[in-house]
Amino acid sequence: MDIAALTSHFGIPGVLSFHEIPSGLIYASVTTPHATATIYIQGAHLTAWQPTGEQPVIFLSRESDLEPGKPIRGGVPIAFPWFANRHDGRTGPSHGFARIQDWTLAFAALAGDDLHLTFTLAPTEMSRSLGYDNFRLVYQLIIGSTLTLRLTVGNDATTPLVFEEALHTYYSVVDVHEVTVTGLEPTSFIDKTDNMRVKPAANAPLVFTGFTDRVYPNTTATCILHDAAGRRRIRVEKTNSDTTVVFNPWKALPDLGADEWHEMLCVETVNAAANAVTLAPGKAHTMQCHMSVEKNTV
């Protein structure tokens, strides 16, 4: 849909409006009594969420490519049907195709003080060229003083669908050097910065002193980002996710400014590798992330 059609079907005066940037990407601008947010139609990609009276919770690189067909650096990319590189020997875009395809906005309504949005993605020319047909994705966002993200995968095929998925959230922090993450203390992890070695559980909060890319399998734990310099805690709860990934590149990237990496941290809601999902024909699987902000008063 173009902006006129989106506005006609889904616009809510003072709450939900649609805009186009020079590259042609369209985004939804959300204002509720308790938060503001931005979601691009490409990738159903949330790039901003800010509860009233708080600093932004979601990080977006100022160097990010906001171009059709290119991934956005920051926000909440949706990885599907694989996480990171494809594993079956065939080529495909990093983190799959879902984040670089236009989704369809199917529902928008204000329920109390929260805005409910639903996006869908059906098979596309790109997905079929990569061997993926007969699936359905439904992505629900509940935007208010807290944020709920719910990704449902449906299998319309007559054979099982094996897939990986992630809500690859970039959180905004004041200084990653002063951030700790709790919740993963009892969990061993795969260290992608050290030749995929399996490392034992640290039994201590996670601190950041260099390039970090850790895959924590077999965990459903709630994580808390303690942003000391920002005097707040970001609570990340998840459902039907058995993998958590923690990432910071510790350097500039082509689409990440030289002084930006210390302002971000990814804590990702994932099902990947040994926790990949095998979905029977006619069945659906829903993974959820719920985030909230708590002020640090000490």
Task: Outline where the language-model segments fall.
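Beta-strand-rich recognition/accessory modules
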Residues: M1-P33, Q42, T124-R128, D213-V298
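Extended, loop-rich substrate-binding clefts of extracytoplasmic carbohydrate-active enzymes
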Residues: S17-F18, G92-I143
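Acidic-aromatic substrate-binding/catalytic surfaces of carbohydrate-active enzymes
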Residues: P33-T91
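Asparagine-centered strand-capping/turn motif at beta-strand->loop junctions
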Residues: I39, L151-A157, V293
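Beta-strand-rich interaction surfaces with strong enrichment in secreted/lumenal proteins
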Residues: E67-P68, F107, V138-Q140, N275-L279
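Beta-strand/loop-rich accessory regions of lumenal/periplasmic or secreted enzymes
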Residues: K70-G96, T182-S188, N195, A204, ...
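Hydrophobic core residues within well-ordered beta-strands of beta-rich domains
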Residues: L137, L147-L149, H285
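Active-site/ligand-binding surface loops and adjacent short beta/alpha elements
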Residues: T158-V162, A166-D242
